[in-house]
Regions:
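Short runs within selected transmembrane alpha-helices of multi-pass transporters and secretion channels
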Residues: 70-73, 141-160, 168-176, 197-213, ...
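Interfacial/gating helices of multi-pass transporter permease domains
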Residues: 43-63, 129-137, 194-195, 199, ...
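Alpha-helical transmembrane segments of multipass membrane proteins
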Residues: 37-41, 120, 154-158, 180-185, ...
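Transmembrane helical elements of multi-pass membrane transporters/channels
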Residues: 20-39, 141, 152, 175, ...
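Helix-terminus/linker motif at the lipid-water interface of multi-pass membrane proteins
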Residues: 30-53, 122-129, 185-192, 248, ...
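Residue-level hotspots within the lipid-embedded alpha helices of multi-pass solute transporters
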Residues: 29-33, 67, 107, 111, ...
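Short alpha-helical transmembrane segments in multi-pass integral membrane proteins
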Residues: 1-22, 80-147, 178-181, 187-248, ...
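Small-residue-rich hydrophobic transmembrane alpha-helices
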Residues: 52-112, 152-168, 275-339, 371-384, ...
Length: 448
């Protein structure tokens, strides 16, 4: 049933409602790196370094592709949450159809353009002829997972936007579980090598897309499907494309920031590069936890905007930040005190260990400096204030480069970490600074 347009729909936001989304999504995000470890382990059993290098390079190429298309998940979450908050069932259903349609179009484009994409990727990343041959084999098969993988982004975003975090967790667990099982089966038992890892991914994405379709059909059971006119509504389709475009630019800026960090690390020599790579992995682990709370902020802020209910928006912002800082503080303490043990577990090279420990304090502080960026990104995605998020990301990237230009000549690798910290902090505080104004514009009839 669709409510009257513009009607205020009050609802409560509590710590329980925040954690009900954050905890399942954190578990879902944490299951993803396990897949990479298993793929590496099963190929490692074949005893061929070129095969390991092949799936590593292929994995990086697809990480870039799918990270770029993450707007399908994030944008769908925000639009669905707003439709749910407004009680607009027709639009809520239409968002899913638009997102899946766009996912399929983009996915088939990846298949069509796979050869030039692979050629460009190999040119940029290099590798021995043996590694490039393995990468080519992996890429040629896994490319066919693109329409399925992107459709799964759409399903995931839609269920999260509806507040169905446990369903999203189930889909992600289903995907990674099947992928792991099939990788072991295809590589170790069928002896398909790198092709087996790629085929396992295609099969797992297909099974997950099927599961997502079934679950979505159940959710839509008994309700009228959106008409062609509703799905292709020019204004709403244009809004979705603008939102996705802004998130895409933001994603490219984020990729650029991390690529710059690693390139500047490499310029300092292999030891510093290895040490910084280990410390960056610690930050990435923290990001999986913080992303869970950011996803909760997306859904609740989006729902509040759709419901036109400012108190729920303010409450979702406050609670997600409180829980975010609590979690970030705990992670920072773990990294600070257990960091040396983690570093020793990740490398046996003594020189790398010493350098990593020397800069550990920076990595331990990144969750505290970055949590505001994660949470504000979630709020702005949910509220679909994507243009502001894009602009503040570009501003933060410029400040990052400026900070590096000043700090690195004076402080060396400490200066690089300082610049990265400035980047994280700038993202969060720049968005926070304009939140009040954007909220007043979005909730004009309600007191601040």
């Amino acid at each position: 049933m669709t409510s009257q347009p513009g009607a205020v729909r009050p609802f409560d936001v509590t710590s329980r409602s925040v954690l009900a989304i954050a905890v399942p999504m954190t578990l879902a995000y944490l299951s993803t790196p396990l897949l990479g470890l298993v793929d590496t382990a099963v190929i490692g059993q074949l005893g061929d370094a070129a095969l390991l290098g092949g799936i590593a390079l292929g994995g990086v190429l697809f990480d870039i592709v799918f990270t770029s298309f993450n707007f399908l998940r994030a944008g769908t979450t925000g639009l669905t949450a707003q439709a749910a908050g407004a009680g607009d069932g027709e639009e809520e259903r239409a968002v899913l159809f638009r997102a899946v349609l766009l996912a399929l179009v983009l996915g088939f484009a990846v298949i069509v353009l796979q050869q030039p994409a692979l050629t460009a990727g190999l040119w940029l990343m290099g590798g021995s002829p043996e590694v490039q041959a393995a990468t080519t084999s992996y890429f040629a098969i896994r490319a066919f997972s693109a329409p399925l993988a992107l459709a799964n982004y759409a399903f995931l975003g839609w269920f999260i936007g509806r507040g169905r975090a446990m369903t999203a967790l189930g889909l992600q667990t289903w995907l990674n579980g099947f992928n792991i099982a099939l990788s072991v089966l295809f590589v170790l038992y069928f002896e398909w090598g790198v092709a087996g890892v790629a085929a396992a991914t295609v099969a797992a994405e297909a099974l997950t897309a099927l599961a997502g379709t079934v679950l979505a059909a159940r959710a839509l059971s008994g309700r009228p499907l959106p008409t062609r006119v509703q799905v292709f509504d020019k204004v709403r389709f244009k809004r979705m494309m603008a939102l996705n475009g802004d998130i895409l630019v933001r994603s490219f800026a984020l990729i650029t920031a991390f690529a710059f960090f690693m390139s500047r690390s490499a310029a300092q020599g292999d030891t510093v590069l290895a040490a910084n790579a280990i410390l960056e992995k610690l930050f990435m682990v923290a990001s999986f936890f913080l992303d869970g709370l950011a996803t909760a902020a997306e859904q609740l802020a989006g729902r509040a905007v759709g419901a036109r209910y400012r108190p729920a928006f303010d409450r979702s912002l406050k609670l997600s930040l409180v829980w975010g800082y609590v979690l970030a503080g705990l992670i920072s303490l773990v990294f600070f005190f257990a960091g040396p043990l983690l570093i020793h577990a990740m490398t046996t090279a003594e020189d790398v260990r010493q350098v990593a420990i020397a800069y550990l304090s920076w990595a331990a502080a990144t969750p505290l400096f970055g949590v505001l960026a994660f949470q504000m990104d979630g709020v702005f995605i949910g509220a679909t204030w994507s243009r502001d998020m894009r602009n503040m990301m570009l501003l933060s990237l410029a400040l990052y480069f400026a900070a590096y230009a000043v700090a690195f000549p004076l402080l060396g690798n400490h200066g690089l970490w300082l610049a990265f910290t400035v980047f994280l902090a700038a993202r969060g505080f720049s968005l926070l600074a304009i939140t009040g104004r954007r909220a007043r514009e979005t909730f004009p009839a309600l007191p601040a």
